[in-house]
């Protein structure tokens, strides 16, 4: 039997044309590849008589080569030719002559040892991950093995996970802890049934693994049935080992971000030593997960003595405090009249609410949202933790606590306030000056306890803050040491929720243990924020150092009216804010300018009256000349001097 022609190139060209036409009719992308291969085969200068040569042609791959080999086989059968061996081996999925030769050479070698198969490692989800939480939720919640819905699993799994079970695309969090359900199903640990409303249940392997996880952690039951309670406090936080909250907090404490050196400093309500605070400040540089307590010792009910209070303050502060105390003791107290029968002190009426007449409610600012599509996240999650809360617009702060009278419905503001910041928002506030202004407004509220809560962002966003890392560390250090705020840094929004829930219970139990009476101020009119703060300070000085536990508080409506950003502001405060609107004018510079020019009118007259004879170029340098002897951040440079002139000198 004769073989086909020696050069098969003309046959391959014909078959490639045919394949290209068919692919074009079908509208497939293969038409492009066949046309490219056709052009390359046409231009190939040498004969093509074996698969190796055919594959060496550009744009001719394995699939094209097999296609042409099959066409050659049909051609040979039709014309009664013998198919070349090399092409026959390619069609049958065999190996070429060279490979066959290699195989035959190795056939005489002794049998090689069979390769030991690696045993597949059992999948075990990481502790406090989404998969870990889902397994435990199904183990505790699906005793009848009938399955749980997604919502039921999330409700039960949340206490076991460090990550939220809801994604938040607005914060670049596209995956949630619930994404782990796919891994559990892939490894046959969890199965599901149904379509529209799926039910999930543990397989036998999943049940055994969940039981092992439960035994390893020593869980007896799901914490979802136990609420935050059984706390024991004196004048500091102390959680009993067998309390239900202790079991929940152990899970939170298992992550580094929730660890503190002792429970007394967890909420900043108990006294802490200066040395321990310094330790935490030093830890700031080495640990990105910062849990801190304020520098100044805090006392929950009784006011500290002047000597112990002064021991943590600079010398100048101590001297000024001493003078102020002397002034109060000698002059102020002498003219402050207290009529206990009519409940009037220094012309201000007050009421007394005894324990049992009021309930404590957590109030969240309505601008505190998780995302535009999930605006009720805080209220929903806190309510699921049995925390009574409400959402309203707040004049200052993001979270406060109020006491509501059970009969009259009147509310008073308690001495606790929180400012919550995502790390990206903190960076923005540092850049535009809001950071310092917001802390000053918090201070004017006259509260005892200030909490500054910082939430981390996803890892991909952390790279954006590389050049701001030093500024972030400095800002947080100043918040603790200078502002005396209790700063807490969290890994996720779920940790913030857990902290607020537990702190609410701490406040309630503190009131119950001390049998605290609320002394409610009924001020008729308050002119500004300074008067608001001074009035509450006078009442605290009078009533909160007695054997009977009192807490002085303004009405919530008074707090809202007095603490508004624009309302109740003095000319000085308004002028400083106007100056800070100029890019580059920090709070320190704005205060320095206001001290030199008391009102906006004085600054305008400085340019238009006192120095009206100067040229425009000289006027632009005036502010730089006026503040050339200032120290540090109060000094004004050439560029900033020109900016101030452009705003105030060209009115």
Curated annotation (Swiss-Prot):
Residues 115-124 have a biased composition (Basic residues). Coiled coil: none annotated. The keyword Glycoprotein does not apply. Its main location: nucleus. Residues 361-458 form the ERCC4 domain. It is found in: Nucleus. It holds the Pfam family MUS81-like_WH. Residues 99-124 are annotated as: Disordered. Its EC number is 3.1.22.-. SMART domains: ERCC4 (SM00891). One of its GO terms (molecular function) is DNA binding. GO terms for cellular component: Holliday junction resolvase complex; nucleus. SUPFAM superfamilies: DNA polymerase beta, N-terminal domain-like, Restriction endonuclease-like. Its cofactor is Mg(2+). The keyword Nucleus applies. PANTHER family: CLASS II CROSSOVER JUNCTION ENDONUCLEASE MUS81, CROSSOVER JUNCTION ENDONUCLEASE MUS81. Interacts with EME1 to form a DNA structure-specific endonuclease with substrate preference for branched DNA structures with a 5'-end at the branch nick. Typical substrates include 3'-flap structures, D-loops, replication forks and nicked Holliday junctions. May be required in mitosis for the processing of stalled or collapsed replication fork intermediates. May be required in meiosis for the repair of meiosis-specific double strand breaks subsequent to single-end invasion (SEI). Interacts with EME1. This is Crossover junction endonuclease MUS81. It comes from Debaryomyces hansenii (strain ATCC 36239 / CBS 767 / BCRC 21394 / JCM 1990 / NBRC 0083 / IGC 2968).
